[in-house]
Amino acid sequence: MNSKLNLNWNLVDEARKSAKKIAADAQVFVDAHSTVTVERTICRLLGIDGIDEFEVPLPNVVVDFIKENGNISLGVAKYLGNAMLETGLKPQEIAERVAKKELDITKMKWHDDFEIKLALKEIAEANVERIKSNRAKREEYLNVYGDKKGPYIYVIVATGNIYEDVTQAVAAARQGADVIAVIRTTGQSLLDYVPYGATTEGFGGTMATQENFRIMRKALDEVGVELKRYIRLCNYCSGLCMPEIAAMGALERLDMMLNDALYGILFRDINMKRTLVDQFFSRVINGFAGVIINTGEDNYLTTADAIEEAHTVLASQFINEQFALVAGLPEEQMGLGHAFEMHPDTKNGFLLELAQAQMAREIFPKAPLKYM
């Protein structure tokens, strides 16, 4: 790419090295810790789904039970694998019995770690294969229909009712939309559980649930066959359940997910240690599933002046890039965020915005940048 801005690449390299150091320092903490959300994600990746009689998701039931009665720092997988050896049951059956108070997986005789890993291996690999086959299915669609050259047109639906969202999404696809983003209901990022099943009520958006993902994915596949185009599906995994929603998206073949390393800290007041651990595991999953992440730099400019704080956008892009690389997410899957949020009366406003956009394009040449 020919540079149009005559950037000082020594400064670019210096900034990238600083961001890399930030990510490496944080990763020392991340590698030594888990969170309840990460443990619930492990439950989901071992096939646990559904709710108890009080509509509490079974992954929450299992993790909370171990927290209260055992030692969650050993990891939920160890308890589940051990229970499988003791009972001969699958993780889903174990979770259901824990929910009914018919089984206490914290009081069982411990088996050898190697045996526990062996017991878990088959089930873990089956769900990994499901994610791999979803990725292969996406690639198959793109091979048959081809992919769009140039920018994707990104359209948001947010009625609160997944079935009405489907109607709008199908109409948008027929009008040329390439990506359908289903905005989450207000406040879902602060729920410490993922709701279950199809939902028909929401406020400013629709609940992100695995069943809602499945319903929308099916509808977009059907209209895609009609239009001979692959329509991408986007949802949001920022907040308290980042890796859980990333796993659900991987299992239902979502194509894009909002995933910012710092968003929960800066804009949702979520514990920063938890956020950094959660974003890492969620990005590992996104990377493996071939999901393009969209980062949240547009949020900076909704809370600060776009000219005075323009540098914060670039700083965040650098940091998001480095956290993504540590998680194994390739540059081609980093939808680094930007937005046009200047006052319309700003002198030379469009020129300033174009320069900032071109700068992002030159500094992150492989990233599918997100402009809003």
What are the roles of these predicted feature ranges?
Residues 1-163, 171-176, 181-215, 237-246, ...:
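Long, compositionally biased, glycine/small-hydrophobic-enriched stretches that function as flexible linkers
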Residues 139-146, 194-233, 276-293, 316-326, ...:
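Alpha-helix-loop-beta-strand connector modules within alpha/beta enzyme cores
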Residues 150-158, 179-181, 226-234, 255-258, ...:
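Structural preference for beta-strand elements that scaffold enzyme active sites
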Residues 170, 247, 358, 362:
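Surface-exposed charge patches
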Residues 252-255, 264-372:
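Glycine-rich anion/phosphate-binding loop at the beta-strand->alpha-helix junction
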